[in-house]
Regions:
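Extended interfacial segments that mediate partner engagement and assembly in macromolecular machines
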Residues: 58-71, 76-138, 176-220
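Short, solvent-exposed loop/turn elements at beta->coil junctions and helix N-caps
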Residues: 114-120, 226-230, 482-486
């Protein structure tokens, strides 16, 4: 086994990927997980390249005054590496990362950067994918004795232990143990977990219940790939167990009915691929379709389907976008004024009440690229909306949502956005919510050619958004912008920009 080297360095700043940046004695840049600016740390090098290295903190020699104890000390680097800083420091770093991205591309933002956060920093995730880990009982006992490690029960992540056996079954079994796990950042190993503090408590409870059920059946991790658990805002859960062998009875119907979930599936996933892709659905239990209401509009989605992970913050982004629909070319006051911030809305009933009072212009055409299941276009787009999405499963869910909403003027288009350019006519408001890679060059070229009056651009990567805006600003100006902390305790940022055609 190749030995990983240790280095002691000083950390200077947080960079776009979310790591802290330092410099090794040989001049190479070192991108470090688990450190904060101003700290001196000992790091373990996990990846080496000619001009840079990647590392994780092994020891903090001189801690930052901003450092706090992570909620999940053993696994936070796997899921949420910014658990080591207070929320106000996290918000400041995210503002700086947005500013750095636009400065890099010579784009001047017209107002101070504001990042909306509802201050719910844990328990917000409605979807978690767990890996699995097994080792022999003897090896586990020896390693725990050497390290002094004790088994941590379910109460670490939730006070609710209903339906969970708080006594480990592993000691009474021969053979392999079975544990939930996440991949350890910076290595090929795994870290055993009882859940994650980012998740809704119902997700952790269900994951542990499935683990305990499989322990009783003496299932080993080598037979399994992953466990996907998802819940709606009420805490009702569905699950998918991805297996490497065709084992349709690994969980029976009676056993599935005993779990704290409304439904679940056993999925055979080709073991030749590390990804949890659906090769064959082996067994189905109960109702596996979830329903959530977004700004008063109900949406149905599958366990494996695309849907927002943090719905309350997403609703705020939608409220902000709605203020820029429709576009009135004769008004100097279409949309909000720079520097004005909408009231923070936390109660979903209040959101629905406010939203239902906003008149929609049914004759204002809307084109929604990278539409997912249609949560943007179908909530803020009024009647005349075209939704373009590349994923066939998402389009099927979108079509079902359109039918159930009786949205007769909405059209779902299955196509990559770069192959649906004829829908850009220059008359519609264009909404884009692309993946991290940003807009396809052909989409940008067509926008500049057809010149729609307004572009609403929501991005999960400010760096590629800034790159795209730099190209579009030859014909467009930034009317408004705002950031959103969809994923607290992680480096991920969402940023909304409203682009209006120059006079």
């Amino acid at each position: 086994m190749k030995r990983q080297s240790l280095e002691t360095i000083h950390l200077d700043k947080i960079v776009g990927g979310g790591q802290a940046l330092g410099t090794l004695a040989d001049g190479r840049k070192c991108f470090v997980w688990g450190g904060l600016p101003g700290e001196t740390v000992t790091v373990r090098i996990t990846k080496k390249k000619s001009h840079l290295v990647e590392a994780v903190v092994e020891e903090v020699i001189s801690p930052s005054p901003d450092r706090i104890q992570p909620r999940d000390p053993d696994s936070y680097l796997s899921t949420s590496p910014w658990q080591i800083m207070p929320l106000e420091i996290e918000q400041a770093h995210k503002r700086q990362l947005i500013d750095d991205a636009f400065t890099l591309h010579n784009v001047a933002l017209p107002a101070a950067i504001d990042i909306y956060c509802d201050n719910v920093t844990y328990g917000y995730r409605n979807k978690v994918e767990f890996s699995w880990y097994s080792e022999s009982v003897v090896s586990r006992a020896v390693s725990q004795k050497k390290s002094g490690q004790l088994y941590v029960g379910p109460g670490l992540f939730s006070d609710d232990t209903r339906g969970v056996n708080t006594h480990s079954d592993r000691d009474g079994l021969s053979g392999d143990t079975l544990d939930l796990a996440f991949f350890r950042r910076g290595s090929k190993g795994k870290v055993v977990v009882e859940g994650t503090s980012l998740a809704h408590p119902a997700i952790n409870n269900l994951a542990r219940a499935i683990r305990d059920l499989l322990r009783h059946k003496r299932v080993a991790a080598r037979q399994l790939k992953t466990l996907l658990v998802r819940c709606d805002q009420s805490g009702s859960c569905v699950w998918q167990l991805y297996v490497k062998d065709r084992l349709p009875e690994i969980i029976t119907a009676d056993e599935a009915a005993s779990l704290p979930a409304q439904g679940g599936e056993i999925i055979y996933s080709d073991p030749r691929s590390p990804a949890s892709r659906i090769t064959e659905r082996l067994a189905h239990f109960g109702n596996t379709t979830l329903t959530d209401t977004i700004l008063g509009v109900p949406f149905r989605y599958a366990c494996e389907g695309f849907f927002q992970v943090n719905i309350p913050v997403y609703e705020q982004a939608l409220c902000d976008m709605k203020e820029w629909v429709p576009y009135d070319c004769n008004s100097q006051h279409s949309g909000r004024q720079l520097g004005h911030h909408q009231k923070i809305i936390r109660d979903p009933r209040e959101v629905a009440q406010i939203f239902s009072g906003v008149p929609l212009a049914t004759d204002q055409p809307i084109l929604d690229f990278y539409a997912g299941v249609g949560t943007i276009g179908l909530t803020i787009g009024g009647g005349n909306v075209t939704l373009v999405e590349i994923n066939a499963d998402a389009v099927r869910e979108m079509q079902r949502n359109i039918a159930e909403l009786d949205h007769t003027d909405a059209r779902a288009v299955l196509a990559p956005s770069e192959q649906a350019l004829d829908y850009i006519t220059g008359k519609e408001i264009v909404i884009v919510d692309p993946p991290r890679a940003g807009l396809h060059p052909d989409v940008i070229a067509t926008l500049l050619q057809k010149m729609p009056p307004r572009i609403i651009y929501l991005s999960c990567n400010p760096v590629t958004q800034a790159r795209d805006v730099a190209l579009l600003q030859q014909s467009y100006q930034i009317a408004w912008h705002r950031g959103y902390n969809f994923f607290p305790r992680t480096p991920h940022i969402e940023h909304l920009i409203i682009l209006d055609k120059k006079p």
